[in-house]
Structure formats: C-alpha cells, structure tokens
Amino acid sequence: MSFFEQQEEEVHSLWVEKYRPTKLDDYVGNENLKAKVKGYIESGDIPHLLFFGKAGTGKTTLAKLIVKNIDSDVMIINASDENNVDTVRNKVKNFASGVGFKKYKIVILDEFDYMTPNAQALLRNLMETFSRHCRFILTCNYIEKIILPIQSRCQSFQIVPPTKKDVAVQIAKILKQEEMQFNPTDLVPIVDGYYPDIRKIINTCQLACVGGV
C-alpha cells in the first residue's frame, strides 16, 4: 500500500468522515434551514451563503451537501490554513474567472473567520465581479469576525446543534453499525462533556472504543 493510499484509508476509517451525512434528509436538526436548502436545490439556484455557529455542529457538512446536489464546479479552501490575500487573489480569482462547463462555480471557504480583513475585502470584490456564475459558501464560528460588506452580500444562517438526546441517538447508531458493545448510559458523560461539538463527541467515542476505554 502506498503512502497516499494509506492516508486515504485512514481518513475513511475516521467515524466522523465515514458517517458524515451523504443526503440532506440524513442531516440532523435545523429543519427550517433544511427546507430553504431544499428549495435552493430544487430550483438549481443559490445565493451566497454564510453559515455560522459553534465548532463541530455541521456547517461544513451542510455546505458539502449543497454542492453535491447543485450542478457546479467546486473549490474547497480551509481558510484556517490559507487565510491571506494571495489565496484570494491567486487561487480563488483564478478559479472564479476560469472557463466552466456547469451552471455555477461554487467556492466553499471553510473557517472563513480566519481570513484576514484585507483578504475578506478582496473577496467581497470577487463576489461582485463574478456574481453571474460564481457563488460562495462561507462557514465560520464567529460571525462578528466577518466584515459587514460580506455579511450583507450573503444569506446568513446560524447553525443550531441538535439536542443532546438527538446526538446520543446518532452516536448509538454509529456504535451499532460498528458492532460495538455499549451501555447507553456510557454515552452521557461524553455527550455532556463535549456538547455541542458533535465532531469531538464522535472522535472521542471512536478513541474510547479503539483504546478500550
């Protein structure tokens, strides 16, 4: 097995990726927002979107579900790693301005609150310049770190985490799929300790099972 095949296998073995929802109907919570998203998908037309809320609550998952169901070319950038003007000027602009063969080009900028103010200002210009065929989906933990001109150009939605009960039900389903023996009461301290970070809860459960904790 090559290094890259090994890395891919490791990613797929992570429960948080293995059990990431692949259909909008499998996405738990935020029912009003799901209804709006279904409307976007059915019409084949979406605005610029800004999803904000606490870490691990499904912002990126929802963004990926949208682009999966919209006829589009997609670029995904993690702004916590690439957060400067060069990223916007080179990577994003080149993608947005290039020739495309689908209805839209969609750029997902994950953890956008890490982007510098100058980079955000430049992105605002790109949102206007390429508005005919390019859409941006931004996710962030702290909406107050996003400049107002970008907020005003997006439909903004707060992602509310599912209830603790719903999270526990989802975790139980994962454990059953993995054929793990467990007592439902064992989930209580993990869910209570890391809620509302669903990603952290899933990772902790996997670590506990693998490590025999």
Predicted regions, residues:
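Conserved Sensor-2/SRH helix of P-loop NTPases
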Residues: 167, 171
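AAA+ ATPase "lid" subdomain C-terminal helix
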Residues: 180, 193-213
